């Protein structure tokens, strides 16, 4: 029985030949991957087959590589994964990192000071500071989320005060140049704020009493970007990768740190519905370009 089953188990490895993992180059890093030999060995042992890392110049190139099948596995930002999903419908998230404090992602918040904006319905009659257009929590999430809730808001809404940076938007609230601002907060997998960072804490650190600050609205959670595989990858390969990645932090933390330097809490399983917020942003962006 065992000898008959072994060739079948090996079929997916034979079909793939070399398992290719795509990552985006670090700024100024060229094609170098810190700890490449250790990472390659770790994935090779997990899959029981030859593994190669492919370094893409940017997420657009990485998306194209996975959509075309040149790589089977890719490490994405949330919006890059959503873009890949829209591009080909051929990818699925496997795992995503969390922070040491349990945060699994972020959400946008609308913050007011001293009750200047009484509620969300009054927003349009006040001055609201908003971050630049490439800022996810300070621009993309509020415009996408509020529009999805039926609130009249657009990039050129007259009540929006466009700040040159997220920090500048915070300063505008602190100096009284704005009655509210769109910021962010970290959120756990349960959808609750972890109270371990974000705009309110930054404003408090800048000298604004926390008791004077109020959150009027929160967006849906944007989960941290996933490691995603092609949907047509063999189920056994997906299982092996999931077991390897979800145990990586506890078993070989040094390898985990090489693979994920921004979020130190380990990997947890992820599913497509975790990225509905990211998909909404990508679709909103696409609609604006048409």
Language-model regions, residue ranges each:
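A structural signal for short loop-to-beta-strand junctions that line the ligand-binding cleft
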Residues: 90-103, 212-218
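A bilobed periplasmic-binding-protein/Venus flytrap-type ligand-binding module shared by bacterial periplasmic
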Residues: 24-25, 107-117, 219-236
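Extracytoplasmic small-molecule ligand-binding "clamshell" domains
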Residues: 10-82
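Pocket-lining segment of extracytoplasmic ligand-binding domains
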Residues: 127-234
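An extracytoplasmic/periplasmic, membrane-proximal ligand-sensing/linker region
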Residues: 12-38, 229-290
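Short, Asp-centered acidic motifs that coordinate Mg2+ and/or phosphate
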Residues: 72-73, 93, 179-180
């Amino acid at each position: 029985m065992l000898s008959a089953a072994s060739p079948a188990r090996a079929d997916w490895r034979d079909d793939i030949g070399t398992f290719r993992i795509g990552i985006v180059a670090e700024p100024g890093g060229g094609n170098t991957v810190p700890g490449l030999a250790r990472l390659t060995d770790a994935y090779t042992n997990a899959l029981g087959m030859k593994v190669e890392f492919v370094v893409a110049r940017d997420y657009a190139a990485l998306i194209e590589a996975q959509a075309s099948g040149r790589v089977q596995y890719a490490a994405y930002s949330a919006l890059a994964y959503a873009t890949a999903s829209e591009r080909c419908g051929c990818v699925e998230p496997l795992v995503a990192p969390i922070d040491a404090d349990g945060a699994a992602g972020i959400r946008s918040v609308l913050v007011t000071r001293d009750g200047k904006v009484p509620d969300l319905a009054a927003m349009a009659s006040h001055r609201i500071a908003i971050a630049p257009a490439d800022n996810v929590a300070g621009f993309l999430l509020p415009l996408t989320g509020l529009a999805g809730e039926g609130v009249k808001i657009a990039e050129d809404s007259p009540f929006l005060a466009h700040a040159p940076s997220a920090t500048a938007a915070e300063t505008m609230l602190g100096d009284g140049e704005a009655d509210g601002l769109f910021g962010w907060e970290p959120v756990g997998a349960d959808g609750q704020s972890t109270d371990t960072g974000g705009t309110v804490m930054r404003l408090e650190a800048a000298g604004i009493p926390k008791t004077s600050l109020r959150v009027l609205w929160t967006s849906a959670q944007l989960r941290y970007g996933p490691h995603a595989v092609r949907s047509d990858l063999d189920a056994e390969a997906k299982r092996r990768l999931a077991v390897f990645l979800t145990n990586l932090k506890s078993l070989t933390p040094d390898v985990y740190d090489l693979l994920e330097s921004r979020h130190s809490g380990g990997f947890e399983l992820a599913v497509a519905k975790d990225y509905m917020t990211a998909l909404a942003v990508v679709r909103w962006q696409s609609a604006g370009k048409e």
